[in-house]
């Protein structure tokens, strides 16, 4: 709610780690609020440790819900599918691939996978499709039609599965991702 009061543009939304928190995709508390804004701005000096504003062009603002937050009114927050897309686009703003995979696992029954695939197409970034497809395979989320659609984004380029981690000497997989986080590491974090 505080974010709504300090942004200077109407096309803002709660995003990344904060949206994951809103949708119950985290297992730990969050101290900072991540807000996408269409006008470059900084949080007030006294709130810089509590807020992070991420600039995005207005045409990229979609997949947003207005959600009632107690008696304080409504806030704009990424829907669960847009939350996943944003997270896979910039894992650094969501704690990395293991946090994202854990969040997908926690909410796997509430996710609209058709909508998620449509959002992948709308973003048109192959790395998002590759990360999502690989995570779905690791977690055994059996949506064959969606996974096959995501495989259509695989080209010759290799990307890092998790850009936050070490960038050398790792195996490559069929999704053309460099495995700097292994499937076993993800499974151990989720199922431990």
Regions found by a protein language model. Give the residues of each.
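Hydrophobic alpha-helical interaction segments
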Residues: 66-192
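Glycine- and acidic-residue-rich phosphate-binding/metal-coordinating active-site segment common to enzymes
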Residues: 49-77
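Short gly/ser-rich loop at a beta-strand->alpha-helix junction or flexible surface loop bordering the NTP-binding
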Residues: 1-60
